[in-house]
Amino acid sequence: MSGAVLMALTLTIGCIGVNTATVQAAEYGVAPATAVLYTGSGAEVFAQPDPATLVTVLPGDVPLQVTGMTSNGYFQVVVNDGIFYVYGKALSAAVGTNAYKLTSIDAKAALVGDAATGQLIYAQNAYDRLAPASTTKIMTVLLVMDAIAQGKIALDTPVMVSSTALAGIPSDASHVSPRLKAGEVMNVLELLECVMLSSDCHACNVLAELVAGSVDNFIAMMNARAAALGCTETNFVNTSGYPDPNHYTNAYSLFLITKEAYHYPVFQVIAAMPAAVIPATNMAPERSLETTNALMKASEYYNPYAIGVKTGSAQSSGLCLVGAAKKNDTTVITVVLGAGNNLMSDGTRLKQQFSETNKLIEMGLAGK
């Protein structure tokens, strides 16, 4: 590193000592790494792997000695014998790159990670316990995918809606029209479309009874599957995410669940559906379904790279979205929990689960 760059950093950083910027092990893991990488123009240097601790901004093509990589997507670098952090996409193995300026996401928690490798590109409060609302349904669908893979059921398996599946679910949790009725027969694929596109809670319970014999048995399976995936701060008490103080998870656990679900091609297809038509049943006329994900249909939030997956909203959870996007051979998974619905100066409302997800997609697919 040149003397001029060292001097500039010394003046900017001042008296920050070697031990001031230490990683908080409870929040961030650090994998050892050794490399010399170059900054892109506008690379930001942080005291900790957290965008709130900005120290300075570097010009392009500054060589930095890397000593590690944090679990939330930062390089650990040495500057003036001190440890600092630079966002991963701000460094490159070659000169002449453009750094991606890191911006915080306006939500209680957010992340974006690689769906293939599991590497997090950006994370913000990713391990905080929060209400997931209907993003819970990804776990419900994952267990249905498991049952299909095990040969226990098939997409064309007919299912009769029981009165017990409908019992105890408030009317505002039914989102298909007309609502499912006891005695109505649909197949597994149609019920999955009701869950993923229209976020129907009754359909979740119908599938739960099919897979596990009862809703309670299915909920136990949900929690066991979450534990096996390494989910933390996670406890499911229903199949749909309907608000309950004992129903919670975190952004990273939703990332793990969604990453697992994406191993199933059928899940990928259903998650990417912008719309579907449910044929007439023995008790209802044809139903038309449309995704609740504004990134996947004509809207101000439309993103051509978006391929899924599930929205969620409740007063207790705020606005939530677990998303996925693909560009060339790269697929990323995004999670936004606790976003707002902000009133803008022109009287419109900014639905931040969508606007913030678009920021995450831009981060995750930069340079791909």
Predicted feature locations:
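Bacterial N-terminal signal peptides that target proteins for export
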Residues: M1-V5
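Boundary regions of SH3-family modules and the immediately adjacent low-complexity/disordered segments
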Residues: Q24-P32, V78-Y100
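Solvent-exposed coil/turn segments that connect beta secondary-structure elements
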Residues: G42, D50, M69-S71, N80-G82, ...
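SH3/SH3-like beta-barrel fold
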Residues: D61, F75-V79, T334
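Penicillin-recognizing serine hydrolase domain
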Residues: T103-A109, G213-K368
